[in-house]
Structures are given as C-alpha cells and as structure tokens.
C-alpha cells in the first residue's frame, strides 16, 4: 500500500524536475520523459521509493534512533521546522553550521551558551551580567544569532543516527558530514541531484512549496508511527505555490524565495501552451486523470 497517492503527487507538482541542461545523468532511472525543456519525474518510482523510505524511517525510529531534518532554502524552512517539532525531532532550517556533526564537541559548547543566554533572558538577568546598555544589546544579538542557527538542535544531546534532507545538492556539506559519520541519509532528490550519495532517495520536485510539504508531512508521519504516536493525514494543501505553478516550474527560486522564470523559458512557455497529444506509451502529464478515491 502506497504512503503517497498519485493524485497528491500530481496536485503538488512533484513530477516537475529541473531543466534538462541542468540534470545529473545518475537520475536517469527516475526520469519519465522530457517535455518543453524540463525533465518529468517518473511518479511510479516516486511512489515506490517513498514507500521504501517510509518503512525504513518507521523501523529505525521504532528502535529509538533520532532524526535531524535539514532544509535551508527559503521555501523549505517553515515545513522543516513544523514537521520536526510535530514529530519531536530536531532541525536545521537556516544556515548549516559547518562541522555541526564532525566537530560536535565544539557545537555542544555553542548550544550550552545558547541555553545560558536563554536562561538569562527568562529571568531578566542580562543587566546583572554586564554594566552598559550596549553590552546588553550585544548579548541579545548573540542570543538571536545562536537561536536562529542552533535553536532546532538545542535539545539534541548526541549526534543523531538519521538525517532527512530537502535538496541534498544545496545541503552538500551536511550530506558529506553525515556520510563521513555513517548516518542513514534520506532525501528528496530532484533531477539535478546525485542519488548515489543518499541511502534512501525519493525522486521528486524539491523546489515547490507544496511538494516539499507533502514529503515532509508524510515522512514526519513515519517518525510518529515509529515512535508510537498518532498519525495525521498530510496537510500539504495549506501551503500554496501558485506563482511557480503558473510558470509551470520553468525557472528557479532565488535566495529571497521568489520564483524567477528562466532566461530561455519564454519560448518554452509558448510551446507548452500547444496541445500535447498523448500516446498509449506516454500519456500527457497535463491531461492525466486520477481516480478521486485513490
């Protein structure tokens, strides 16, 4: 039994990969076709790999293993934090602190500093620690910086056994550290990623907000089920990615999170508006009908 329906995958744009000129050939087994300069991901493979990842994550967490959710791109930050907290696990959703895993003893000192500053804030003792308003302001800025970077792992006593990543290409440093230490790595891999670096790759769009939410909510459920909690239905429809959907994902997200149409996408856009005649072997993605009861 699948853990994500084909209907939900289509609705959230999971099948839209990157432009063909940006692909990683190692993703070939997961590509269905190319259409208007964009690779279309084989959703049958996504269903299969999502099920494998779900079952493995459920089993590992049932054994008491902990998960670190990682996703620092703007469109992933909210869902990363929400689903990590929902499953009572840990997260990094801003900048990855280099050496977080490989230099853990140093990172623990920074976490201890964060907790000390939070305790000082709670009992209003900043003024007792320093003498001037400028020094108080410096402490508060230090607190906010540490909270932003390490807030999602401040209760992480040891290095976790599992990492779940959105966009392992962007989070390549995190993936390298995890591989070096032997963590089990789960990740959503778009057509520009190297799936061979991941223990449990799930082929899919790692840029669309709703696709990211669908994957994270589903895998959060695997953790909750593994730890004996109550599983909820994915709530991905609460997130909307209408701008990218209107442009048929023919572009990239910039650092501010705005979806920008690619420089050569205008001509592709006009071609995309032409009707696509499906064949028996290759149904048009834009005309797939899905059983509403699936």
From Swiss-Prot:
GO terms for molecular function: structural constituent of ribosome. One of its GO terms (cellular component) is cytosolic small ribosomal subunit. GO terms for biological process: translation. Residues 261-294 are annotated as: Disordered. Keywords: Ribonucleoprotein, Ribosomal protein. PROSITE patterns: RIBOSOMAL_S2_1. Transmembrane segments: none annotated. Gene3D superfamilies: Glucose-6-phosphate isomerase like protein, domain 1, Helix hairpin bin. Pfam families: Ribosomal_S2 (PF00318). Disulfide bonds: none annotated. Residues 261-274 have a biased composition (Basic and acidic residues). Belongs to the universal ribosomal protein uS2 family. This is Small ribosomal subunit protein uS2. It comes from Leptospira borgpetersenii serovar Hardjo-bovis (strain JB197).
